Amino acid sequence: MPLKIVSAVLMAAAILIGMPRVAGALDPRWPPGPYKYVVIEQELKDALIEFGRNINVPVKVSDEVKGKLRGDLGAGSAEDFFKRLTSGHGLVWYFDGSVLHVNSASELRTEVIDLGRILPTDVVSKLTKLGIADPRYPIRTTPGSGLISVSGPPPYIVLVRQTLIAMARQVPQGEDTRVRVFRGSSG
């Protein structure tokens, strides 16, 4: 196997092994202590937006998020409350560092992106360093293919795509700087 391929494989493995350590940076700063929220009858979307106000984190909720909340939601931390709401209602979320995005699980999708001359390992490295990569949403690469497959909610896919476009602008002139997106679905 040529040295470049071995190096690329080792680099990708090192990045992927290190990704879980970044996971803490992908969560909002949950406030300490118990979080109490009383619901009489409220739209799920409104409760999530109110939750964001209560913890000082902007929350953007997709129009696909539907449902009503009733009754006692139990006590616990703000993180427990949020994760109980999202998992109990078929929702997924992504925190981009400033906004907490909440989507229906039905909105998850997969895109295959042609990187042109950008190396897949460079993409994974850049996304990890920027705090964009999220171990819950896979980025799959194959050395030498020039393609990556990205799965996740729409805000995550958009941020990955924006990063790739910015990286393509940094490729020296005269080189192939195309980034092609192939849309797909994970379900």
Please tell me what each predicted stretch does.
Residues 2, 22-187:
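Sec-dependent N-terminal signal peptides of Gram-negative outer-membrane/periplasmic proteins
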Residues 8-18:
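Bacterial N-terminal signal peptides
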Residues 1-9:
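Bacterial N-terminal signal peptides that target proteins for export
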